Swiss-Prot record:
Belongs to the TPP enzyme family. This is 3D-(3,5/4)-trihydroxycyclohexane-1,2-dione hydrolase. It comes from Clostridium perfringens (strain ATCC 13124 / DSM 756 / JCM 1290 / NCIMB 6125 / NCTC 8237 / Type A). One of its GO terms (biological process) is inositol catabolic process. The keyword Hydrolase applies.
Amino acid sequence: MRMTTGQALVKFLDNQYVSFDGKEEKFVDGIFTIFGHGIVVGLGEALYENPGELKVYQGRNEQGMAHVSTAFAKQNNRRKIIACSSSVGPGAANMVTAAATATVNNIPLLLLPGDSFATRQPDPVLQQIEQSYNLGITTNDAFKPVCKYWDRINRPEQLMSAMINAMRVLTDPAETGAVCIALPQDVQGEAYDFPEYFFKKRVHRITRPLAVQEEFEEALDIIMNKKKPIIICGGGVRYSEAGEALVDFAEEFNIPICETQAGKSAIKSSHPLNLGGIGVTGNLAANMIAKDADLVIGVGTRFSDFTTSSKSLFKNPEVDFITVNVSKFHGEKMDAHKIIGDAKVCIEELQAMLEANNYESSYEDEIVNAKKAWKEEMKRLTNIKYDENFEALIKPKREGCIEEFSVLTGGLITQTAALGVIRETIDDDAIVVGAAGSLPGDLQRMWETDVRDSYHMEYGYSCMGYEIAATLGAKLAEPEREVYSMVGDGSYLMLHSEMVTAMQEQKKINILLFDNCGFGCINNLQMSNGIGSLATEFRYRDENGKLEGGLIPIDFAKVASGYGLKTYSVKTLAQLKEALEDAKKQKVSTLIDIKVLPKTMTDGYDAWWHVGIAGESKIDGVNKAFENKEKNLKAARRY
């Protein structure tokens, strides 16, 4: 079949399918584009001539559209993707951050950046990087460290092996992440006689591999000698759809479950054995129980520093680790005994073996008491008001900063109370999306849901700017559900271009913008380690040349209304509830500009986070923070 490389690529993508548990579905939904000279007349021509069943989407920012695609794949539990194409140079470079985000989170993302000429005839072409020591280097080489597979198509016939390997990685639960196929702009238009069998329908089967028997037997020996195990429910539980199996396992042996950010909403928040979020952004209940656990069973988790509290959370000297993970790389962390396979079938097999040996944990009332303590704390958090009895959750180091914000904006809302109102007002099956700032911590601790896959948090790369784009991605994946972006003013200012794409696609998204005039959580981290506030609040430069002037007020509702969104500006809890109710009635996208008081987010609960504090300073507070870091480090695992 004689066709161009671009045409062959489109035809190939249109014939890719996945099969999971007997259900077959199309894998590639479409292609996001921001056309430039390096892609529009090659791949662009192919998409115009015959896109097949692929939808062509128009992005507004290359990073933004790639975040949309990442969220789309995540919300589809990695079984459907939207590819992303860009021009050469800056357009391609804009997708590098999104590639890293997808790879860290093990989410399939196919990137198709245009590239310099393979022939080099017009070098240096517009937007080309030139390196005197290697003429073969282009901007697209920057994708290599952040992708799970990378290739450059210098000849049309190379497309075939490249795309087969791309699909291998994209559909492999253990290896998936970003894939970059760089497309030199001249090669895109080159014609070649491709064999017809390259375009046959391909069904990529996502299987449920079962670990070898020896791994189960060794795990059985460990568990039988443990009295107080805990389970950590990671993202692998979600993608394997193993939530019910995990709950059955926990109920059978009375083992409490703690959640990572990626694992939240895989099981019901209301379940008596679900303690909620664990670690640095975890809650009181989970961290209390984790401290004394003698066994940690990690299911589908990477054991990030936030989950393990920089490897200091599990204080029982007899603690051991078992991991159930489809990835051997992640399975070997923490010196864990590994069970390498699919979460669902491996948990079921392990349960059968433990039942045959009559295993049961020795918990009595510890789980109930821990949940009761957290319930009381939740009640306190959701009822914090800015009144005569107000006390900030984060002790302000800058005197008068809360009052200054309130006077300037009129805002009277505490962040934890706002989350309480949001949870009680929006639909039970609504999807909430987040990524960065103080909101992921508050949400992992406070957000409760019994609806599967309704919590969508990117906390592997914690990429500012993911939130709004990802909200559109989740909406494209599940158009019948309301989707809410939980975004701070810092992340909003970083990237919100795909609001326009949402308007274009006529897909309603809801943006809940928490404005506290700064990078609030980093200001907390900065000042809690003895440093004064420096470039973490949004302040004017003062007469002394420092960023110490007044706070910069921004009317975000007014800005968003210019894009065509229905907007609300709220300064009290009553206004917030009214806006949320009205937003549910709207057919267009909405933005609620919530003026939340600084220092009213949650703090940590018996968890430590290892950050690189200065080992020598003229500031007493920094020196004390360093001493505290060294003390905690001595109590933590070394690896």
